[in-house]
Amino acid sequence: MSASELVTELSTRFKDAVLSEQMTADRFPTVWIRPDATIDVHRFLRQEIDRPFRMLVDLWAIDETARKHRDGLPPSGITIASHLMSHERNADIRIKIALDAEYPRAKSIGSVFPNAPWYEREAYDMFGVEFEAQPHSLRILLPPGWEGHPMRKTQPGRATERPLFNMTASLFDAKEHALAADPEKFGLPTHRDGVELMILNYGPHSMATHGVFRIVLALDGEEIVAARPDIGFHHRGAEKMAERQTWHNFLPYTDRVDYLGGVMGEMPYLQAVEKACGIKVPDRALTVRIMLSEMFRIMNHLLFYGTMAQDTGAMSPVFYMFTDRERGYRVIESITGARMHPGFFRIGGLSMDLPHGWDRLVREFLDWMPSRLDDYEGMVLRNEIFRARTKGIAAYDTAMALDWGVTGPGLRATGYAWDVRKARPYAGFENFDFEIPVGHAGDCYDRTVVRVEEIRQSLKIIRQCVDNMPSGPIKADHPLTTPPPRERMLHDIETMIHHFVSTSWGPVLPPGEYTGQVETVRGLTQFALISDGEPSSYRTRIRTPSFAHLQMISAVAPGMMVADLVAYLGSIDYVMSDVDR
């Protein structure tokens, strides 16, 4: 069924509820519906339609009050957009509803999609949208007591525009009290079978939480009865920052959304921007992008591998693997000039060409790693203690993973071979030979094995990049390429004007909505951009995999021991900046 046929079927089924179809530059059909039909439409798409849209990929809000280019769209003060995916169809659909700007209210779709509540809480936190039947109408990224909703267009975009903050003693006490592990506030039970449960603050300053993050637990002895993750301690307002940076200047921020993913964070953003501009990136630049992205996949997975072993009691592996990461970072630094946050990609290509001797450095790393991985397999994967701590622990199946929006290794460990690089090839991945590692049990052990095998596949991809690196330019010959090719800067008055505009004011993208999707180290990362014909983004929505993966803790943790929770958290492989943005 094509996208147009899907919209037709939806319009036929809900004649009075479907208001219009929005034409976007994406391949995703976008349909506006009446707010009172929200639950029925989402239930139809998830449960009743052939090859259903099982996964809620994202849900976000848009403040439309300052938007100028809205021709043909229904009147809206605040828009709620939900992004659904059908893996069987390899297709997505977006559903939008228009709300009042002053008092935005919508129906919760938590009864249809189990992972909707956190996204709805974020829409309330950032935009003030209240959802009916939302079980926990709490702020999620901002601290309790925060005044206002910062993503609204009436809210300041810089700290210097806000009133001076003064932490009085009474305010400090109030904030401390608000952070207490109150079971009623978190919806936790206090008794089971007549026995009082212990409420435990697990984090935020715990080595096992891998970042500033806490889980409020209800315990019966060592058994977890209920768990409520509490996030937001690392929130920096990345989406708000995008609204006050030019399209080009926001690039370094994308490296830091997932600070272990490096240049991979730049890929979905650039994919969306280049789609908006109609830029065709040269083959050499695309191949370099793939090579560096896979290098960072290896760097991340080595860190995961070592810390996962450490979380389950093995001390030595993490030191060996940090030695390997140091070798890898030397290669990355030699090529890009930086280690963890290179900011190496540009709109239309790369910041610079590969240096002399780059291939020798990469080949040395490729020759070094395989034997090391063989050693680690005996040290970790075949270790009886590691196997006892991970096999059968925190297991879930494919259906549960799709329900909670799990992507990446967490989904593939259940036996489902879904990888954006294969299903929806980008940047030239269709030209590379590699396999998708999968597990079968969906437990901590399989999630580890999948990532280890991904290291081997990344080595295979990188070797193909080195052996088949195209020649040619590293930047597109396009007026919106930023910065423009230097050799064209003084060619004539026209190129000089383009250079001046791009480097001073910044490139202006055509009005519209554009999306980039990439298989990053943790799963599906998606940038949904709205351009209003300005040098900066009108709305940048960043969908990260870690956000969805942590929400699932409340469904997986009950029934396991506290010690098993350590292994489960390690196997998720999340980064708190990726969660909180």
From Swiss-Prot:
InterPro entries per UniProt: NADH_DH_suCD, NADH_Q_OxRdtase_suD, NADH_quin_OxRdtase_su_C/D-like, NADH_UbQ_OxRdtase_30kDa_su, NADH_UbQ_OxRdtase_49kDa_CS, NDH1_su_D/H, NiFe-Hase_large
Entry GO MF terms: NAD binding; NADH dehydrogenase (ubiquinone) activity; NADH:ubiquinone reductase (non-electrogenic) activity; quinone binding
Highest taxon of the lineage: Bacteria
NADH dehydrogenase I subunit D: annotated span: 196-581
Pfam families: Complex1_30kDa, Complex1_49kDa
Catalytic activity: a quinone + NADH + 5 H(+)(in) = a quinol + NAD(+) + 4 H(+)(out)
Chief subcellular location: membrane
Gene Ontology cellular component annotations, sorted alphabetically: NADH dehydrogenase complex; plasma membrane
Ranges where the record places region NADH dehydrogenase I subunit C: 1-172
EC number: 7.1.1.-
Disulfide bonds: none
Keywords, ordered alphabetically: Cell inner membrane, Cell membrane, Membrane, Multifunctional enzyme, NAD, Quinone, Translocase, Transport, Ubiquinone
Locations listed in the record: Cell inner membrane
Topological relation to the membrane, as annotated: Peripheral membrane protein
UniProt xrefs under PANTHER family: NADH-QUINONE OXIDOREDUCTASE SUBUNIT C_D, NADH-UBIQUINONE OXIDOREDUCTASE 49 KDA SUBUNIT
Annotated family: In the N-terminal section; belongs to the complex I 30 kDa subunit family. In the C-terminal section; belongs to the complex I 49 kDa subunit family.
Subunit annotation: NDH-1 is composed of 13 different subunits. Subunits NuoB, CD, E, F, and G constitute the peripheral sector of the complex.
Function: NDH-1 shuttles electrons from NADH, via FMN and iron-sulfur (Fe-S) centers, to quinones in the respiratory chain. The immediate electron acceptor for the enzyme in this species is believed to be ubiquinone. Couples the redox reaction to proton translocation (for every two electrons transferred, four hydrogen ions are translocated across the cytoplasmic membrane), and thus conserves the redox energy in a proton gradient.
Protein name: NADH-quinone oxidoreductase subunit C/D
Organism: Rhodopseudomonas palustris (strain TIE-1)
Source taxonomy: Bacteria, Pseudomonadati, Pseudomonadota, Alphaproteobacteria, Hyphomicrobiales
